[in-house]
């Protein structure tokens, strides 16, 4: 259902949504959600990245079964996410409150997130005519936009945990694309 909703989040003809699903290693339906020719009957699943989430080192046989399933899917899904490692990385910086949080990740898995949190991601389009100076200016402006965007936390239709987490951390990402 969430993937179907994400299909309609389009601005200027460009999809503006990304999803991640972190499931148990034992969840066989999620393991095979993007196996075979899933795009024929369930094209909306293209909007989500699916990963198995484990909290402790799995048995080698279980891990290899998951790895084999990923290979056989021919879609690069389901990925493997180590929550214990994410918790250690979040703690390592010394800037984040770890107690009481189970960390996950954003759809591309480059940012460690609390449950019910997102990153304010700003994109800079790289053009063939850009110079180092023009790119630095774009990154500066994207940082300002993302910082402002992080203050917009009046989320009327979701739980208050989203507001609390996004205000406490105000995560910001700037990426180059194009």
Residue ranges: model-predicted function:
Residues 72-178:
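Function-dense linear segments that define catalytic or interfacial modules
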Residues 4-99, 176-178:
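Conserved, charged catalytic cores of large soluble enzymes
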Residues 1, 9-21, 151-166:
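Flexible, glycine/charged-enriched surface loops at secondary-structure junctions
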């Amino acid at each position: 259902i969430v993937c179907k909703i994400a299909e309609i989040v389009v601005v200027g003809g460009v999809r503006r949504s990304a999803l991640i699903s972190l499931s148990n290693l034992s969840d066989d339906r999620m393991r095979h959600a993007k196996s075979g020719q899933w795009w024929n009957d369930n094209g909306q699943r293209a909007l989500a990245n699916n990963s198995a989430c484990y909290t402790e080192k799995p048995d080698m046989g279980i891990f290899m079964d998951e790895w084999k399933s990923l290979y056989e899917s021919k879609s690069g899904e389901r990925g493997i996410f180590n929550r214990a490692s994410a918790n250690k990385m979040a703690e390592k910086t010394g800037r984040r409150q770890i107690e009481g949080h189970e960390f996950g990740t954003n759809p591309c898995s480059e940012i460690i997130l609390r449950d019910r949190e997102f990153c304010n991601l700003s994109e800079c389009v790289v053009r063939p005519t850009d110079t180092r100076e023009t790119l630095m200016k774009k990154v500066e402006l994207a940082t300002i936009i993302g910082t402002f965007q992080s203050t917009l936390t009046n989320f009327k239709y979701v739980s208050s945990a989203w507001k609390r987490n996004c205000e406490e951390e105000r995560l910001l990402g700037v990426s180059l694309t194009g």
